[in-house]
A protein has these predicted regions:
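Conserved AMP-binding/adenylate-forming core of the ANL superfamily
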Residues: 42-73, 85-87
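Conserved ATP-dependent adenylate/AMP-binding module captured primarily in the ANL superfamily
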Residues: 94, 109-139, 156-173, 188, ...
Length: 300
């Protein structure tokens, strides 16, 4: 592949997506690493245990990854394709690639092999990072990166022996992946703009349990995932038309009802929302369910 080919504007179409320039991202990372170096920046559950990255750890990892990328031939003319669940490795690698000056693209992690091959032929990444082992064989044409090799020898992420929440600690939460169109930009911007910690579950299957352990103060979720949460709430309520459901509907319709507060507190605790104070949503949000509307009304 020639340099001239790489300089051509990419005709990127979903399920592939180009991560736009985030000019302040590295500056913000340096900022938080300087003023709150020991505060937790990232959390991720792995094999049943929570791990944490302080802001100073995140900055150092980005710098190490940038050096590792350069050693793998990544430069201003390169393209890095990312696919998989959002978690610390993926976010830090995206920031490292941008710091080198190369392009970062995401490819939805839920496409079938035929679509995947078409997209890889179209975007022609010079390097790739794929998490799902089931997908690896479909990325044979790409120059797949080994995260551990890129990072080099370093201290392992701080292991949280016991999960605890200091009074007033904020924690953003996401349980998404590259299937969320525009999601990576949302996460990076919200995380780095706020300086709040950002936590991720071990998997989609364990998301509710892991979320309950974190009790996040903010949600960074796609409209589709918010709808999934709404459906989960709906599935735990009594069937429509029953007296129990009519009682729930009546309680929601009467703001001063003690029963309403009891029901909402129960739902909040069930979903890990007892500390929830912020729900990210796009400027043009779709219609939302009654329960999510209630949560947002409380927050406001």
């Amino acid at each position: 592949m020639s340099v001239h080919e790489l300089k051509r504007p990419l005709a990127v179409e979903w399920p592939a997506e180009l991560l736009g320039d985030l000019p302040k991202a590295l500056e913000q990372l340096h900022h938080w690493a300087q003023i709150t170096p020991l505060h937790t920046a990232l959390r991720h559950k792995r094999q049943g245990q929570w791990y944490a990255w302080r802001w100073i750890d995140a900055l150092r990892d980005v710098e190490r990854l940038a050096d590792g990328l350069r050693q793998q031939g990544f430069d201003e003319q390169s393209r890095l394709a990312l696919s998989g669940a959002f978690e610390p490795n993926l976010l830090l690698l995206a920031l490292a690639a941008q710091s080198v000056g190369g392009q970062v693209l995401t490819l939805a992690d839920d496409v079938d092999p035929e679509v995947l091959h078409q997209q890889l032929w179209r975007i022609r990444p010079t390097h790739a990072y794929v998490q799902d082992r089931r997908q690896v064989r479909h990325w044979q044409s790409a120059n797949r990166l080994d995260f551990t090799q890129l990072l080099g020898p370093t201290e392992p992420a701080q292991h949280l022996q016991r999960w605890w929440q200091p009074a007033g600690e904020t924690a953003l939460w996401s349980e998404e992946g590259t299937h969320w169109q525009g999601g990576l930009a949302v996460l990076l911007e919200q995380w780095l703009n706020s300086g709040h910690g950002l936590a991720f579950p071990e998997s989609q299957a364990s998301a509710r349990r892991d979320r309950s352990e974190v009790a996040p103060t903010g949600l960074l979720l796609s409209p589709a995932r918010l709808q999934h949460l709404a459906d989960e709430i709906e599935s735990r309520l009594a069937r429509p038309g029953t007296w129990r459901r009519r009682l729930c509907d009546w309680a929601i319709a009467h703001p001063q009802s003690g029963l309403r507060r009891l029901l909402k507190n129960r739902v909040r605790k069930l979903l890990g929302f007892q500390r929830l104070a912020y729900i990210w949503q796009p400027l043009k949000a779709n219609a939302e369910t009654t329960w999510l509307a209630e949560f947002k009304r409380d927050i406001a």
